[in-house]
Every structure is written in C-alpha cells, then in structure tokens.
Amino acid sequence: DVQCILTKKQGHATEIAQRLCDSGEELRFYACGGDGTANEVANGIIGYDNASMTVIPVGTGNDFLKNFGDDLDKFRDAENLWDGPQFPMDAIDVNGRIALTIACSGIDARVAADVHKYSESPLLDGKSSYIYSLAVNFLFKGIGSHWTVSLDDTVMEGDWSLVAVCN
C-alpha cells in the first residue's frame, strides 16, 4: 500500500513520521522535497526499527543526496527506489534533534536560512536566491561570531565564521 501525505507546516513531516512509526508496522518513507524535508522525516523515524527512508529530490539544494553520487536522477524515479537497498546510517545528535550529514551554525546556516526568504521573490529562482543570500550575508551581516562548542568532554571557545560537525 502507498499513502501520500502532504505536509502543511514546518515540522509536520516529523509529526507524521512519528505517528505512523508508533503503529509498529514496517514502513518506508519517500520524502519528496529537499534537505529540510529529509531532515524532518529522519527526525521522525530516528529510534524506530520499523522504519526506513529515501528522498525524491524536488527541493532547492538536495545536498543530502549528493553524498550518494552526482546522479540525482536515480532518486527521481520512485519505481527504482521501491525495492532499493536499505542500509543503516549514523546521525548527528544536536541538542535532541538529528542531522543526517552535517550540522552547521554561523554564516553557512544563515545563508541557508535566508535562501527560503529570498526564494519567495518572483525575480529569484533557487540558485539565484542562494547567490543573493550569500552576498547579503557576507556584505551586510558580518561573518564572525563568538562560539563555545562542546563535543563529548571537549570544550572549544573562540571567534569563528562557521562551526560544522560532519557525519
């Protein structure tokens, strides 16, 4: 059986995935979107042994899928994904939420957050809204901040433009 559910707000994919996983039924999620949708579904299924996921790339960046090679078309064919291989994947725990491949804070995260705001303009498409966001953040918002980063028993403190933890 296949069920298509449209999300209605930010965080909705996480809520849906958790609710469905609670049934105990064996589930496979096909997150149709980009990195944000993939992250929401992953946060909804983490810790459930009865769920797996893949992504059909229709988002702005689709950076998560680029970790599996340059050919995004293989992920656009839902039939190809139907019985595709499954494998476990590590995740990064960031204050109770998970990140699949990278957790960033600083200039990179600001640029990514602003892309969505600028992409609402009828004059900018996905790529040009990214370039515009990059320019605005570097030219007008500054690039450095003071950070305290704790990782297990290690604490680091300093002024950096970007803090990233990668999986």
Name each model-derived stretch.
Residues 7, 47-164:
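Catalytic core of DAGKc-family lipid kinases
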Residues 1, 163-167:
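Short, intrinsically disordered, charge-balanced linker/junction segments flanking boundaries
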